[in-house]
Amino acid sequence: MDMSSIASRLGLSGSRPVVGKAAELRRLCDVTFDSSVLGIGEVCKAIICLEIAASKFQVIFDRAEAVRMSGMSEKAYIRSFNALQNGLGVKTTLDVRELGIQFGCVRLIPFVQKGLSLYKERFLAALPPSRRASTDFGRPVFTAASFYLCAKRHKLKVDKLKLIDLCGTSSSEFTTVSTSMADLCFDVFGIAKEKKDAKSIKGSRELLDVLPSKRKHDDDSDSSGESSGDDQDELDLPTYKRHKKMEKEAYNDWKSSVLSSNKQTKPDPAKPRKQAQLNFKKKPSDMALEVSSAAN
């Protein structure tokens, strides 16, 4: 497939410098080594060259569409991308100033630079001396993760997917680096999270009042420990809860009245009970039968 047709399908047909640089990288790849040894086909090689060229010119590249066109999984594509990039000796760089200008967050530049330097110091201090020399902090994912965390801390909206596409990494690797930075440099990147009670927020409280089933457990626990308060306190209660309390009070009044009436109608257990004698008047025919039976 021709490079220009692949670029048009990826939405890069209007960027002539990107297409020219990708064609140059493809020729360099053919001269330097055989990409088939790495398991990279011709179409995938052209797509990776386009992505490297797009990252070099700071042009947005649709990686999801590129993975779909290559016919590979995301992990296999990233592995092939890194192998081809290392084979060509090309390293993508991501400047903090360019990110600040592109996303409209110029005031974050000093915070990002401070956080990156602090993360490097603390990360290297935690590593053994034998591994410190091989650690590479020049990868764009560190700059992008630092920029994203600073924007999140200062409550600025930044497109995370756009950042991931710019740094040329996967979402899982970006999340891993972001978590590591937030853990090591919580004073620079961390965000204090406090779980607020839903009843303390006015909007949530009104929403819960509309859905009585959501407050069932709260009503049961509150009604067991609450006593009858003032009229002002009752007015402050939500509508559903106020009706519930009125129904409970009416039920208690009815229950007490029933119990008191039962006590009044109940006989006194101290008095002895006497069985009444039943004297029925006998008919003359019954008396004649008794006399005849006695005579026999």
From Swiss-Prot:
Positions of region (Disordered): 212-296
Organism per entry: Oryza sativa subsp. indica (Rice)
Subunit structure, interactors included: Component of the origin recognition complex (ORC) composed of at least ORC1, ORC2, ORC3, ORC4, ORC5 and ORC6. ORC is regulated in a cell-cycle and development dependent manner. It is sequentially assembled at the exit from anaphase of mitosis and disassembled as cells enter S phase.
UniProt-annotated location(s): Nucleus
Compositional bias (Polar residues): 254-264
Lineage: Eukaryota, Viridiplantae, Streptophyta, Embryophyta, Tracheophyta
Molecular function GO labels: DNA binding
Name of the protein: Origin of replication complex subunit 6
Function per UniProt: Component of the origin recognition complex (ORC) that binds origins of replication. DNA-binding is ATP-dependent. The specific DNA sequences that define origins of replication have not been identified yet. ORC is required to assemble the pre-replication complex necessary to initiate DNA replication.
UniProt KW keywords: DNA replication, DNA-binding, Nucleus
Family stated for the protein in its record: Belongs to the ORC6 family.
UniProt keyword DNA-binding, yes or no: yes
UniProt key word Nucleus: yes
Annotated GO CC locations: nuclear origin of replication recognition complex
